[in-house]
Amino acid sequence: MINNQYTQLDHETREHDLYAHGKYRLTLKTLERVNLLNGHESKPVLINVGCGGGLFNKLAIEAGFQVFACEPDPTAFELATRFNHPNLKIFLGDISAIQPPVLADVIVCHDVLEHIDAENIALRQIADSLANSGLFVISVPAIDRLFGYHDEQLGHFRRYNKTTLKRILHFDFDAQSVRYYGFFAIPATLYYSRIKKVAYPELISARSGLITWIMKMLISIEVRIAFPVGTSVIAIARKRRVAK
């Protein structure tokens, strides 16, 4: 059962969530590496599925993308629409709410699939909205044994690992890379969410002081180095070409 108050707080604090910022930096580094912004006469199209409060929308626009975003939660949608930009269109609903439909050069899906029971149907919809060989960047929570209070309050159905994520992507995508993120967050996740079954403390969104400095340093390390396990798993995949 989704806790709407908990979910709203999760969206509202995302702007200052250092963990989320690191994940978004990883995504943008990937998009820079594949050179999506070169060779286009116009801005490449990015669809942000489940955009939440809209933080990544801003970052993607700053990076040079034309962004189409969708968000099914009305509260998060309202937060996202507070940011207006000529290169941004936001729709209330899932990816099918984007009208008229667009074919994207890249689709980003941060922490969305775990909310969806019929995950294969959702992935097929995403594949149908990608251009041939389009890029798909997805992050999901990792490690089954960490499933706890945080997951329950947000209405998660599951957590993943590298193997299970690659398996579900296989039907429509070719995985280019799959890595973990959040190694240093494992102790806090285990203690607060799994053992104590309480909300994470406000430390995760701290904005100053020693704790913030330490967190920024650890996240900076994780952006550069993939550890053998973490609280999230992130995949970069290409849509399989459809024969004409």
State where each predicted segment sits.
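A short His-aromatic
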Residues: 111-115
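C-terminal helical/coil "lid" or tail adjacent to the Rossmann-like core of SAM-dependent
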Residues: 185-214
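Short, glycine-/aromatic-enriched active-site segment of Class I SAM-dependent methyltransferases
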Residues: 136-158, 162-167
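Conserved N-terminal segment of class I S-adenosyl-L-methionine
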Residues: 1-102, 106-110, 120-123, 204, ...
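A short glycine-rich, Lys/Arg-flanked "PGG" loop and its adjoining helix->strand segment in the class I
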Residues: 120-135
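Conserved S-adenosyl-L-methionine
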Residues: 173-183
